[in-house]
From Swiss-Prot:
Cystine pairings recorded for this chain: none
UniProt key word Cytoplasm: yes
Protein known as: Elongation factor Tu
tr-type G domain ranges (all copies): 10-201
Gene: tuf1
Catalytic activity: GTP + H2O = GDP + phosphate + H(+)
Amino acid sequence: MAKAKFERNKPHVNIGTIGHVDHGKTTLTAAITKYFGDFQAYDQIDGAPEEKARGITISTAHVEYETENRHYAHVDCPGHADYVKNMITGAAQMDGAILVVNAADGPMPQTREHILLGRQVGIPTMVVFMNKVDQVDDEELLELVEMEIRELLSSYDYPGDDIPVIPGSALAAMEGRDPEIGEEAIKKLMAAVDEFIPTPERAIDQPFLMPVEDVFSISGRGTVVTGRVERGVINVGDNIEIVGIKDTQSTTCTGVEMFRKLLDRGEAGDNIGALLRGIDREAVERGQVLCKPGSVKPHTKFEAEAYILTKDEGGRHTPFFANYRPQFYFRTTDVTGTVQLAEGTEMVMPGDNVSFGVELIAPIAMEQGLRFAIREGGRTVGAGVVSKITE
């Protein structure tokens, strides 16, 4: 049977459900597919397969659906630890999120934690679904819960006053009853998501960046750098910079090859070889990046949000303390760095997610939101994301 062709006639947005355990994330996901996609039953979504991202095993369910304006890929995770790991590793990129809050409970510890994580890992916006409203008889109580959610969002620098909060019942929508809080609430929610979560800039429209994977010298032609273009476009004749590890160098791309064919350009997603003018083979190494001049700077100090693997996940068996010195694997290479723990944090246990500062021994081309693995002698012991660059 021929595979269904992916129609790219609508903008594509990646989204996910977040929120406290048992507040109805998976039921809501199922309800959205009932009205906007190929219906997926609750247990189909909940029995999510495991996948590996940056050496970490995560269970995530992926569903897709579309509104009149957009195509959505939606991720839902069965357990809280899976959410933390997913958000930190960026295994399933989220351009926006639907925060699910049970109206009877109001915001709970994981509600807060997911909002904070969203802020740290750079989820730009959220829309709120206030679920299980049929379990609350008092209209004033609903208003209080809504206020509480808005204040919580504002306290983490989200626009709490402007974020749409949609009351409803995912279960009513699933069971096809009480349309006002069922089907209509789901439709209102998706209208809010359509309107409030911005369409992300496509990778190809962003400034050019390619991590260096390998470097060759071709006699009579010069130095060729290979890698996969992460974003943007490179044209023959473009000026580019080589950033990271050593001092930044400027050069011109004099040729682009793909599968040994000469091209006039390479774009996001392509595996290419770029021929660089006047650059010695020794001057470029794996771990640097080629990029549009001035678009990315090298840094050594940053703050990070990280998840530390448990022993069962193949991680450390013991906690680590201040001045822990693992390797930080950025894009294509390991760089040693020293960890500075926050005041009041004595140690970090396997299974924790934690914020800390890092100082690398060599500069790396980095931006806020860049993901990395934490490794010890080639073994992954954690994953993290740059939440703030300090130097």
